[in-house]
Design a protein with these regions (language model features):
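An active-site-proximal structural segment forming one wall of the substrate-binding cleft
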Residues: 14-40
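Short acidic/histidine-rich active-site segments
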Residues: 35-47, 87-95
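Conserved N-terminal phosphate-binding loop of PLP-dependent enzymes in the Aspartate aminotransferase
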Residues: 49-52
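Active-site-proximal substrate-binding groove within the catalytic cores of carbohydrate-active enzymes
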Residues: 70-258, 275-277
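C-terminal beta-strand-rich structural cap/linker in extracellular carbohydrate-active enzymes
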Residues: 261-292
Length: 292
């Protein structure tokens, strides 16, 4: 179906087309107090060609299209420096340094299921930093996987990047709204470490029933550790989660647990993973380095 969603692609290899888009979008942004724009990309390029080019130059079209797109983005983001623009990887596959130059964050995937996102975000983080990955809590049952994942785990999964929500809050219970408040408060506490710290992958979802990662703040004083178990196992043995990149001679306080462990203990013995019941369960720890 070349008419995806009844959409066609404008020929951005043509200057007049770029001029039209720049002015049209600028008028909209000037018409209201707009602070955030999601720049979606959902149409594949098919039957690529341009009326602007001769027959022997038609193979230049895709390249010139991207140059035109960069020009559009350069002009619009320069005109509106206080607007946060978010690009989209779903459909257009444009999660790349070229787009990130103009739009500092990208919607990591149109797949918003929290469990599917574990692999998506884990893989994306191999190339792009967490601050650039749009990661949102979505409604359940998930509209794609039809999976019901606990709100806590949806939150932990989304806090692996640029955190937000992708749901209708008017349909949430009062209890869920309170949990959202707690999640937002928590993310504000850990945001600097998540977005500007160093990411370490502890367990991969590609070869394990578990996934875990940790972020260490720039000053090495704060640590955020996230853990998700995908499916429950009968008679599963107790296990620890070994951390990395800590100061072995320093002590770390586990916030909220009244526990202090040395860096040596955390790296060679690990954090005790508590008893977790059911599928799609999670745990997030905050650690703070203590002054000696």
């Amino acid at each position: 179906d070349v008419y995806k969603r009844q959409q066609l692609i404008l020929d951005l290899s043509m200057k007049e087309v770029c001029d039209y888009i720049i002015e049209s979008i600028s008028k909209i942004l000037e018409s209201a107090n707009i602070s955030y724009v999601k720049w979606d990309m959902n149409r594949n390029m098919t039957e690529v060609g341009s009326l602007e080019l001769t027959s022997e130059r038609q193979r230049e079209t895709a390249h010139r299209y991207i140059l035109g797109l960069y020009r559009v983005m350069e002009e619009i983001t320069s005109r509106f420096p206080n607007v946060l623009f978010e690009s989209c990887s779903g459909g257009g596959g444009r999660f790349d340094p070229g787009i990130l130059y103009y739009m500092p964050q990208t919607w990591t995937s149109d797949d918003t299921d929290a469990i599917e996102r574990l692999k998506i975000q884990f893989g994306t983080s191999m190339v792009y930093p967490p601050i650039s990955m749009g990661c949102h809590v979505s409604a359940v049952p998930n509209h794609q996987a039809n999976r019901i994942t606990p709100l806590e785990t949806r939150g932990v999964s989304a806090m692996a990047g640029n955190f937000g929500y992708e749901l209708d809050i008017t349909k949430l219970s009062e209890e869920e709204k309170e949990e959202l408040k707690e999640q937002i408060s928590l993310y504000k506490e850990i945001r600097e470490t998540v977005q500007f710290g160093t990411l370490y992958r502890l367990k991969s979802p590609f070869n394990s029933n578990e996934v875990a990662w940790m972020m260490v703040s720039e000053d090495k004083n704060e640590v955020v550790v996230s853990y998700v178990r995908q499916w429950a196992l009968v008679n599963e043995s107790f296990s620890n989660l070994k951390l990395t990149a800590l100061d072995k001679d320093s002590e770390y306080e586990i916030i909220g647990e009244d526990t202090i462990l040395s860096g040596d203990e955390l790296m060679y013995i690990g954090l005790n993973i508590p008893e977790l019941y059911g599928d799609y369960v999670s745990k997030l720890w905050k650690l703070k380095k203590k002054d000696l």
